[in-house]
Amino acid sequence: MRNSVVAALVASFLLLLTHSVWSAQAQPPQKATYAGNEVCKACHAAQVEKFSKTVMGKIFISNPRNDLEKRSCESCHGPASEHVAKGGGKGVGIPVTFRKGTEESATAQNEACLACHQRGVQTYWEASPHAGRGVGCVNCHTIMEKTSDRFQLAKVDDKTPFFNKRAQTEVCGQCHLQRKAALQRSSHMPLREGKIACSDCHNPHGTPNPVMLKQASVNENCYACHTERRGPFMWEHVPVMENCGNCHDPHGSNNDRLLKLTDPRVCTSCHIYDFHPGTPRGLTSQFFFNRSCTNCHSQIHGSNHPAGKRFTR
């Protein structure tokens, strides 16, 4: 009887000891806490001063709208108590860093931004081609200092005029080299002049449309400016209604009016076997061969004239 009691006590003690050891091992590590903006400013005064001049800095420091924004530096970088306890240093004890050369993944960096920027133009970010290719917000935007009048665009070099729409062209052109090169062609959209920007046609944060177009189709995108081409027309030109890109290269061309080919070659790319009426050998007449089709067919985008079937009026 006595042996049974002793055995039971020993078993209970061992079970209690095992539970204590397991509990100690299972105990999660102490989480970092928020140190406060003044603690950050004690070491990073220059950075805080630059940040305070940005749109985001003015909100966080002077007019925070919620508890997250009140944390200022730690709103994006996370709790800094561990960073302070370890004496600071680049990347030491900081949950999220955004500096160049950091080992932080683009996904982790973007999550800090998406804590606030979830709606509006950022709605489709997670499913966007840029997110899928590991592009980080800081690849296009600068956080800590004001570099552009809008969008906190990343600074490419000291010569780039970052206070007009040309800034977007420079930022996008860092990756989209072919598109940037096309803008140097004789016929081009006025992006390099700063009259329009890439974001007038595309949403770089993602859309449910092809090639991140702001509108549902290429034509709808073009009609946003070229309203006179929208129609509906009594006589419609099918390739035009199908896709403006059938004839035009929107980023730039060495042909007039952004045409992919010279006129009439852009027409004969479809009208291969169409012989011109009134000529004995089709297009071999000196009055028609290699001449501009639009000299006569001037309403090529569509016509509302009762006799405009051939787009001549």
Language-model segments: residues:
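Bacterial N-terminal signal peptides
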Residues: 7-19
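Short sequence/structural segments immediately N-terminal
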Residues: 17-313
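N-terminal secretory signal peptides that target proteins for export/translocation
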Residues: 1-3
